[in-house]
Amino acid sequence: MSFARFPFWRVAPSEREGEFILPVMPPATVGPEGAPHVMGGVALAAAVDALELASGQTLLWSNIQFLAPTTHAEELLVSCEQCGGGQSVGQWLAEIRSNGRVTHRVNAALGAREPSEQRLFSARPDVPAPDDCTPGDRGWGVPGTLGDQLDIRIAHEDEERGMQALWSRSQAGFKADSGWLAIVSDFFLGAHPATRGGSSLDDTFRFIQGCDDGWVLSVTEFAAFDRGVVHGSAKHFSQDGRLLAISSQSGVLPRIPRTP
């Protein structure tokens, strides 16, 4: 097992204003040997990083559409443009390309209306602590890819109700910031046996706050399987119970379900 010491979703500015480059490293990828591709959540995290750099503000929400594969991509080019907003909150667009082809489109809002008082209404469910849970399967690719970057523990599963509670953290000790939580938000299709091997269509990610301790509890609830597509949502909590983020997603179910 090998894991990245540097946040593998961080982008670097290009020579053009509002344009950023993500050098694709193995930890950013999933897939079988010989056919790695950038995990959708990593692409979202790269877009979030680029948008925060371009705007100088913190993400509020984003929605990404997964348009085309990124197999064997060596770098992703992220272009950011403000399209609206006021003095406190800006509305932005981002487009991600690989070898000139558009692979993702992102809508987002960034900023804050201050002063403001935080109130959290969603409460973390009572589940076993990470040390008391069964380790999860990280077999998402060959050694050195995204699966090696994660420590995963299954806190609760109910296939009949379409629910899962999953603890996860970075093996390298990365903070659960907006970028890392964007990656975590795309674990959606792994939360039910019938969805594994499917293809995400989108990911809507709402960022509340980050945390330093690393462990994140993702509580996923599937709403429906319909017309070959799954719909659902998730809430992401810190170990001390604070709400960190909210996400929702739709994905195409696999034609042939994977065997457990």
Model-derived regions, located:
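Terminal targeting signals and extreme-terminal segments of soluble enzymes
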Residues: 1-260
